[in-house]
């Protein structure tokens, strides 16, 4: 009986994850016992399990932090925020996938299984409290990401992207584990994060050369997951070759999970080397902001452009991680990440819809879309403007708060480069918007001329447009109500 109560006590800390596991089991059972006509049940179960997980997480929001499973998992306010963000990403991505899966005749069950399992791995990663659990959760997320990126097996580009993703992902995980091994040895054989810190203090190794090796190795491993320059080589190919709903999912969840990991590892274990990891992240953020935005200008593929744009966006988020020592630092990072989820997924919703109706991803082929589908063109324009940071959209207020916190924390170089690169990003976003709104027949390509006109431009007719409406509304209005969001983040964290 005592063991049963202990199981209930510890299991309560991962109740949202348990709901996802139950949803996965139900998906498998229904797939084995029913025919293909019951496909709506697959989406219903997936969405229901995600929504229930969010609900349980919100109900447990005010509970005291707790370490369970012999120190393997920590339920803290910080982990709850990032687990919520991952669940939110996953919930918004499923409606994006419904029409795509139907049109491309992809296997539904496996797709949803991999997506939910990746979300599960990301949630466990956000609360993992020891080096082994971190690695297992990270690999759970990564392996599902590899499988999702290569889901269209008959597509040569998808196979090529998956192979690059798998090889480079495996190499980065090896480097990350190499850094963990240094921490394990220097701390005297500890794996729990706080015990690693205590072990480094007891062995007087917190300022040794080995710590610098561990720091660099872990930064390289996490930099790959965040698509930081120069560990970004996989990103454009995976974005271009993978199914668009998969790219939408990976573009946000991987950054949320890796940001949570980076924040906990650097701020806790490398507390005594704060100057070193601040400098290292500053260099990576500057490179990402500059190269990401400059190379994005030259792209002709919409998804490749967003791949390079995402490198610049994660550079902005790094400012919040570096400024995380202050009360506003983490709050600014979380606030901008919330805005980025809606801005990015809204953009991808428009790309999925356009791709299904035209079969192209070339930026030039978007010319004149406003004449055929004003709703999609207007939605894409708003999301791109928000990504660029145009007032009064959410992206502007998120970046403004992020840069202000970075300036307050003394990251003057980062904050000087950030707005400049943001202005450059506005250039290539506006170039796309100009194409969208053109009415010159000479510029309109056959793809748009043959575009299947919607019966009504401003009424949602499918799940993609429903997701689009949610994301566009959030991208335009959340900046106006940013103060309550910041207050919730600060109150939760501190």
UniProtKB/Swiss-Prot annotation:
One of its GO terms (cellular component) is chloroplast thylakoid membrane. One of its GO terms (biological process) is ATP synthesis coupled electron transport. The chain crosses the membrane at residues 6-26, 39-59, 81-101, 106-126, 131-151, 166-186, 211-231, 277-297, 305-325, 336-356, 377-397, 413-433, 468-488. Its EC number is 7.1.1.-. Keywords: Chloroplast, Membrane, NAD, NADP, Plastid, Plastoquinone, Quinone, Thylakoid, Translocase, Transmembrane, Transmembrane helix, Transport. It is found in: Plastid, Chloroplast thylakoid membrane. It catalyses: a plastoquinone + NADH + (n+1) H(+)(in) = a plastoquinol + NAD(+) + n H(+)(out); a plastoquinone + NADPH + (n+1) H(+)(in) = a plastoquinol + NADP(+) + n H(+)(out). It is a multi-pass membrane protein. It holds the Pfam family Ndh2_N. One of its GO terms (molecular function) is NADH dehydrogenase (ubiquinone) activity. Belongs to the complex I subunit 2 family. NDH is composed of at least 16 different subunits, 5 of which are encoded in the nucleus. NDH shuttles electrons from NAD(P)H:plastoquinone, via FMN and iron-sulfur (Fe-S) centers, to quinones in the photosynthetic chain and possibly in a chloroplast respiratory chain. The immediate electron acceptor for the enzyme in this species is believed to be plastoquinone. Couples the redox reaction to proton translocation, and thus conserves the redox energy in a proton gradient. This is NAD(P)H-quinone oxidoreductase subunit 2 A, chloroplastic.
